[in-house]
Amino acid sequence: MSARAGIVVTGTEVLTGRVQDLNGPWLADRLLELGVELSHITLCGDRPADIEAQLRFLADQGVDLIITSGGLGPTADDMTVEVVSRFCGRELELDPGLETRIGEIVTRLMARFPDVDPAAVIAANRKQAFVPDGAVILDPVGTAPGVVVPGTPTVVVLPGPPRELQPMWQAAVAADAVQTAIADRVSYRQDTVRMFGLPESGLAETLREAEGSVAGFDRLEITTCLRRGELEIVTRYEPRDADAYDGLLNMLRDKHSRELFSEDGALVDDQVAALLAGRTIATAESCTAGLLAARLTDRAGSSAYVAGGVVSYSNDAKTDLLGVDAELIAAHGAVSEPVAEAMAAGALQRFGADTAVAITGIAGPGGGTPAKPVGTVCFSVALADGTFLTRTSQLPGNRSDVRERSTTVAMHLLRRALSGGG
C-alpha cells in the first residue's frame, strides 16, 4: 500500500466560506505528484480543541503524514503550532535564531510604515519563534515559519496564505522526517483529457463499455468532472498499466472524436492562445458584457493578438458601435444569428482584426419568450476571408451560469474556426 496523508485546513474564515480554500486542492495535487495517497481533507475553525480533534481523527485513520495550513500568525487565535506541539507530545521552545530572522523581516516590512513602532510589532511576532522541541524549521516567506515535527504520523505545519505556503513546500518535502513518512509511496502517472459537447451520461455509457472491453480497466483510477460545460477526465495509474490507459484513450477517440479536444490536459484557452499566434482578434459582446474579452486576456502575452472589444448591450450600441443595421435587428431580433454575424463583422472592421467573435443572448432571469427562452445564445466567429462560423445554443442554469457557459461555447467555436474543424 502506498504512503497515506491527510490535510487539515484551519481558519474560521475558511470554515464559514468567507475565504475560499486554495491550499487543500493545491496540496492534494502535490501529494498526488509524489505518489502519496490522500486519505482526507478536513476543515476546521481556529478553536484548539477542533484542530486537535482533526489531528487525532487522521492519526486514527493510520495516515503516515499530516499537513496543516493556517494558524501561524502572531495573533491570539493563531494556535496551530501550539496544538500540534501538544498533539506530538513536545514542548514549545523559543528558537533565538528564528526570533532574530523574524525580527529582521518585520523591520524590513515596517520600513514602509514610518508611523508604526517596529519594536512593538517585533514583540507581537515573537510568538512565531516558538517551535516544538526537535522540529525542523522551514524558513518563513512572510513572517510565519513552517515546521516539520517527526513522529507517527509526521506533521508538517504550513502557513495559510498560499503565497507563503507554496514556496515552502519543496523544503518541507525534502525534510528527512517527511521522506521517511512517505518512503512507501507508489509512482503513479496521471493523464487528463478534456471533452466538449458530450453529456456526462454519454461518457458514463462509454466507461461502462470500457469496463468490459479494455484489459486492465479495473486498475485505472478515473475521476470525471464537469467544468465550465467541459468534461474533464483524469486517470491515474501505475506505469505498468499504461496499456490499459492507452486502450481507454483509443476508445474515447473512436467514440467521441469530435468532442475530444485535448489529450494532454491543455485547456481550450491554451489552445486558442496558440492558434491566435500571428493573428489579431476582436470581440463583440452583448449578454456576456466583456467576459469573453477578459478570458482572452487572462493569458500573459495576450496583447500580441487581442486588438480590443466592444460591449454592445443595447440595440443602439450594436448599431452605433458595430454598424449593425437597425432593420436587421427589427427583422430578426437582437438575439439571432444574422445579428451575431453582423456584430462579428462590425468588430472586424472597427478594430482592423482578422478574427472576431460575437455573442448575443438572453441570460435571464427575464426577457425570454416561447420562441427564444432564457438561455438562448447566438454566437458567430468571423474571419477576414469572409468565413463565418455561427451557432445558436440553449444553455442551462441561472444568469451567471449562462454567461459563463457562453464564454466557453465561444472559445470552442473559435478553436474550431481557427483549426479548420468547423
Curated annotation (Swiss-Prot):
Top-rank taxon, per record: Bacteria
Pfam families: CinA, MoCF_biosynth
Listed PANTHER family: NICOTINAMIDE-NUCLEOTIDE AMIDOHYDROLASE PNCC, NMN AMIDOHYDROLASE-LIKE PROTEIN YFAY
Family listed: Belongs to the CinA family.
Protein name: CinA-like protein
